[in-house]
């Protein structure tokens, strides 16, 4: 699969060529910094909440929840499929569900375009680095904590899969929420990073809804789970 991103102003163009389709997907990217609040400032209750919860997260190692956070850290279509297919109620793979797989790739590309400017602007240090602890997985870019990119894509995936299979919305959205919380358990994000990620994920999904090409992919995906 070949992916190419052409950014012009606030317009993102994602070109994806696969065995089943060649689509040109264009969506507008709003300035996320103008929408979400900045990270909590030191001395505020929200900041103290971030510190308290994140510090406590380093004491839940060797638990099932910690192991789930490690698994959820797999940032790839394979990882997303593994995280969501049980809640989705249908297996997800490049071979069996190529349209859904293509959507996961599109979301992965789009997430970086939506979150990277804010991450670079706020330059927030991740919890494991701040507290001199070890994260549940090896993590680079220690100053890109806000907002959470994993949460953004996890929430957007949950919204998208719920549109494809609405009969499983309860299970899918619960899993999407857990996917975000895994970032706190992992020690790589503060609660406010994750909360911002849920919002950015919703914004990203709303922008994708304006794309006729994306809607056509959704319709193909709906047909896949009927087979």
What residue spans do the PLM features occupy?
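Positively charged n-region of N-terminal signal peptides that target proteins for export
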Residues: 1-4, 193
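Bacterial N-terminal signal peptides
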Residues: 8-15
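Boundary at the C-terminal end of the N-terminal hydrophobic targeting segment
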Residues: 19-21
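Hydrophobic alpha-helical bundle signature of multipass membrane enzymes
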Residues: 23-186, 210
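Short alpha-helical linear motifs
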Residues: 123-128, 156-158, 194-202, 222-225
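Interfacial helix-loop-helix junctions of multi-pass membrane proteins
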Residues: 178-209
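C-terminal membrane module of polytopic membrane proteins
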Residues: 205-227
């Amino acid at each position: 699969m070949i992916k190419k991103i052409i950014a012009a102003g606030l317009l993102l163009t994602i070109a994806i060529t696969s065995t089943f389709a060649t689509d040109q997907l264009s969506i507008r990217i709003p300035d996320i910094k103008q929408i979400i609040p900045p990270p909590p400032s030191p001395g505020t209750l929200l900041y103290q909440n971030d510190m308290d919860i994140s510090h406590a997260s380093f004491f839940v190692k060797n638990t099932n929840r910690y192991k789930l956070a490690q698994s959820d850290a797999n940032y790839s279509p394979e990882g997303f499929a593994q995280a969501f297919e049980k809640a989705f109620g249908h297996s997800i793979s490049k071979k069996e569900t190529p349209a859904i797989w293509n959507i996961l790739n599109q979301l992965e590309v789009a997430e970086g375009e939506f979150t990277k400017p804010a991450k670079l602007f706020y330059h927030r240090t991740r919890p494991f680095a701040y507290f001199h602890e070890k994260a549940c997985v090896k993590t680079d870019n220690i100053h890109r904590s806000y907002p959470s990119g994993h949460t953004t894509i996890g929430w957007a995936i949950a919204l998208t899969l719920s549109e494809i299979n609405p009969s499983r919305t309860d299970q899918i959205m619960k899993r999407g929420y857990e996917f975000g919380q895994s970032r706190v358990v992992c020690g790589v994000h503060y609660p406010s990073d994750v909360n911002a990620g849920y919002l950015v994920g919703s914004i990203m999904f709303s922008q994708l809804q304006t794309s006729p090409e994306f809607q056509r992919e959704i319709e193909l995906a709906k047909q896949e789970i009927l087979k």
